[in-house]
A protein has these predicted regions:
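Non-catalytic interaction-recognition regions
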Residues: 1-172
């Protein structure tokens, strides 16, 4: 609760967000590691917004939702692929494209850590994309292309976390 209040004092539904993040942190920590490995559990680590944690992934989802709110675009049709050739955009799109195969591998191995580690990779790729690509730009075609990437990343993060039983707050 304190972390959420500190990060965003004006946030509505602080209690609901804190509950989603707290429960999600525990689930993510448990499912991030392979089932047959011993894990050291510390509250400080699992509640951190830095590193390979559930709150980091949930915060990334909320960041993507914020980008969409700020651009005012919620849907984008086909885009011109020549507009998204920078390294971070391509890397993120390649990561997103792997989602169906990741689900298959996780199911075949009965190993949820495959999904949690994949979702972490998408979150990390998205954050690199976010830091290098402004979405709210004048060029409407470029804006739509970048927003499309945000929409796709947000959806994959949500779907991956849903499979793990973790809820995604729209704001944090």
């Amino acid at each position: 609760r304190e972390i959420i209040a500190e990060k965003n004092p004006d946030l509505k539904d602080k209690e609901d967000v804190a509950q989603k993040v707290g429960i999600g942190a525990i689930i993510f920590n448990d499912l991030y590691n392979q089932r047959i490995k011993d894990v050291t559990f510390t509250w400080e680590k699992i509640h951190s917004f830095d590193g390979e944690t559930g709150p980091y992934v949930q915060y990334t989802y909320a960041r993507a939702a914020s980008v969409l709110r700020k651009t005012g675009i919620t849907e984008v049709g086909e885009i011109d692929p020549s507009l998204v050739t920078d390294e971070t955009s391509v890397a993120l799109l390649k990561e997103i494209e792997r989602f169906p195969e990741v689900i298959k591998v996780a199911a075949d191995r009965l190993e949820p850590s495959v999904i949690s580690r994949y979702v972490m990779g998408v979150a990390q790729s998205f954050n690199r994309f976010y830091h290098e690509n402004q979405c709210n730009v004048e060029d409407q075609k470029l804006k739509e292309a970048r927003v499309k990437i945000v929409i796709l990343a947000k959806q994959v993060i949500k779907d991956g976390l849903d499979l793990l039983g973790i809820q995604c707050p729209e704001q944090m």
